Amino acid sequence: VAETGVTCYTCHRGQPVPSAIWFTQSHEPQGSNFMGDKAGQNEPAAVVNLSSLPNDPFTPFLLQAKDIRMNGPTPLPSGNRHSTKQTEWTYGLMTHMSTSLGVNCTYCHNSRSFSSWEGNPPQRVTAWHGIRMARELNLNYLEPLQATFPSNRKGELGDVAKLNCATCHQGAYKPLNGAPMIKNHPELVGKPAPAQVASAKP
């Protein structure tokens, strides 16, 4: 990542299974559906800093590609159909990111206008790419291992362990506080991707 790189230790920290992993949650205990659907809320969990927010913000955003942006760019809704309930899922992910990196909202956002990218710190772009990186790793590398993982390494719904921000960051704004991993492990550096040349059509 950037100029520092990552190794197995970045996530594993000397353990066979990284400490910060997640599985898709089964929100409703069997037989409780006659009392209504809590939608994964009001069950405090460490991943959302023990708040009442939905406690599995990872499945919709780091496994699926649900819309994270909730507020519109205009004072009135003007076609924005996102609800408060949907917004709470976004807040759940943002709370997780905040605690995982040891930062607050203004590390990535200009709180004057959350809907605008103008005037935001460069970390917002990094976070945008980080969300997509986590999703790609979950979908393209971990999910295909479903049949390989033994049953004792799977979640309650039979899914494999997946990663989120805390898997690598573990409370630091840069994993391992930016320790240079490439310097001691140059053999892990992949070959640069070939440059794409646009073909000129007559």
Residue locations for each model-derived region?
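Sequence context surrounding c-type heme c attachment/ligation sites in exported
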Residues: 1-202
